[in-house]
Amino acid sequence: MPAQTVGAAETAGQGVTINVYNWGEYIANGTDGSLDINAEFTRRTGIRVNYTTFDSNEALYSKLVGGGADYDIIIPSDYMVSRLIHENMLAELDFSNIPNYQYIDDSFRNADYDPENRFSVPYTWGVVGLFYNTDYIEEEITSWSSLWDDRYAGKILMFDNPRDSFAIAQLLLGQSLNTVEESDWLEAAALLKQQKPLVQAYVMDRIFDKMESEEAWIAPYYSGDAAILVDNSDNIRFVVPKEGTNYFVDAMCIPATSSHKAEAEAYINFLCDPEIAGANMDYVGYSTPETAAKAYMDPEMVESPVHYPDEEILARTQVFVNLPENTGKLIDKLWAEAKMGGPGESAVLVAIILGFLAVYIAILVYKRRKRKRELA
């Protein structure tokens, strides 16, 4: 059946503007000879796109719960989709407006994060790995422990979000990425605190730029973005460490507060057109959940083990799930401490501040008493 790119909902929505909130560098935009996806959608449907970006699932969640923004399309990762469903923050999709959903592979349907397949449509998938510069790191990297190697001090980057950073420590410790045991999270946090002095920066989208400019030598990153740099560099290598990694799916969803649900569904349908999906994935570098889209993609990308890891690698992956609220609060607390170097450092800082304050108060008291004596 041919793809359907213009439907009744799209035609009815001409003149409407939808607000799309997506990850940075996560859609073809007309640069480097790519198709401008949003412009093409507007050309075909008359529906305009106001497109803004975020750099972590947690930033997306904070923006949604904080209010003040009316989004029609968001693209969270699997575990965040589950959380948003649980908190009644997503609209149920009308799949009669998304006929191109037929092209989504069966293996991506009825996923654990959306078991009834009511609230999301897969956009991309990938894995997390390590990429490093072979001009500065000559030995072959095989383990996440390389991010704790003091030979690379000041040249190591880490994710600036808790789930991804904790996952690296958890994999080294042999833990489940979805443990709810407080002792596990404390152990992982201790490992991250040990790493802190070696880390140049905690960043997200800037990982790519820092690695490209050789400001950093080694960093964890998502396979799609890493693949772009690997494909365009002779000295950048990407590896999935032996301890395993996180496998993720990012999915298109509509917030329950959307003002233009039918037009948003038209946008999802457009992105599911195999030809559009192929052109899009060619640019963003991530893996498509549509086998049909591969016919429109660069054959080298389709055959690349970075873009499409083999079964041996996939067998060593874990998928994030939404964690209980109390575990989430613990993670946030431990993450803040880990980035500061732990409560030990913050306690020293507090002690110093209190010490200065005590001296300042003592001086004020002394001056006041001295003045009283002089007046007497």
Locate predicted features.
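Ligand-binding pocket segment of bilobal, Venus flytrap-like solute-binding proteins
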Residues: 157-161, 165, 169, 177-241
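Mature extracytoplasmic/periplasmic domains
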Residues: 255-316, 360
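Short beta-strand->loop
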Residues: 91-102, 120, 234-246, 255-258
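Ligand-binding "clamshell"
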Residues: 85-92, 114-118, 228-240, 301-305
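Early extracytoplasmic/lumenal segment of secretory-pathway proteins
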Residues: 10-83
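Short loop->beta-strand "edge-of-pocket" segments that line small-molecule binding or catalytic clefts
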Residues: 146-162
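Conserved C-terminal helix/tail region of periplasmic/extracytoplasmic solute-binding proteins
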Residues: 311-376
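A structural signal for short loop-to-beta-strand junctions that line the ligand-binding cleft
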Residues: 65, 69-73, 91-130, 155-157
